[in-house]
Amino acid sequence: ILAYCAFVIFMYLLYHILTLVSTCSKADFFTFFGEVQKKDGHSACMCTCWNMTDEENYCEIEAPVARGEKNLRTATKQAAEKLIDEGRLGGYLAYASGTPIGWCNANDKSCYPRLMSAHPSMEGQVKCIMCFEVLPDHRNCGVASALLRHICDDARRAGYTCVEAYPNKCNMLSENDYEHMVHIYREAGFLCESRNNQDVWVKKIKEEKI
């Protein structure tokens, strides 16, 4: 029964995922992270970390907070809004009954300045997946898998040659989270490559039409 319910939710979500590419969905982005803050209490970064240079992070978040000009949440929200407006922070929101319940930070590799130095790009266009976040009430229901499938399909339509993911243990809340994400990537056809002593999960995108 549980497996069937998960499958039904999975299929439903496949058609209720929106690409965060314009200001029209900013409200849903911040609504979602507001819920994460209330239910999990760990949404401080709002997925801005990898999209900012060290200098930007210091000038726009760390310094204003240290000077007492802004609290961390306000500074981070303003930084996230700027990144979205500039097209540097992008990703996908999953919805249930019109409410955002899941998020994945995924975009062109050039949008992640910190990542570019740690994981040099392969030839051709590369779409990167940085992190997933799902509201507690909707976890273990296939939300992340639905998002991942949609991202790979979207990357294929956009002409990307591959999708890369970096489920580093130090970025996960627990060992179980890491193992769970590795399982999801493996099930989606990703293969593990070792680069600079770190695991990178890669899915080659075929040129065939879908």
Spell out what each predicted region is:
Residues 78, 82-89, 95, 99-131, ...:
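Conserved acyl-donor/pantetheine-binding loop and adjacent beta-alpha core of acyl/acetyltransferases
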Residues 134, 140-156:
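Conserved acetyl-CoA-binding loop-helix of GNAT-fold acetyltransferases
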Residues 176-210:
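C-terminal "cap" of GNAT-fold acetyltransferases
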Residues 45-90:
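Active-site rim helix/loop that mediates acceptor-substrate recognition in acyltransferases
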Residues 8, 14-63, 208-210:
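Conserved N-terminal entry element of GNAT/NAT acetyltransferase domains
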Residues 155-175:
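Conserved GNAT acetyl-CoA-binding A-motif
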